[in-house]
Amino acid sequence: MTIHGRAHLYGGDGQLRIWHIGTHHDYEPDGSSWDRVMKWLEAGVKDSDKHYASPASMINLFGDFRVCPVEPFKKGSVQRARVERVEHRHYAPVD
């Protein structure tokens, strides 16, 4: 399924999440797609931010994500999913 979402790396604890905008639901990339999503985030890091310990945590990636859940939906829980692609990428700094 394709969702409009925001990908963010939480630098303090290393959680990588894709929030499905307009919902209270988050996806976590599974092992097969974690590196792929990290590369998308890192592609949006400005040179001036690359000196931070976790530069990918300084930005948000908005876009249309193709996600394929690998576990059943459970209300209130993060759902692991294979993330196949993102279209219409837009990077925004974390406020």
Model-derived features: where do they sit?
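Beta-strand-rich cores of mature extracytoplasmic or soluble domains
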Residues: 40-95
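N-terminal secretory signal peptides
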Residues: 1-46
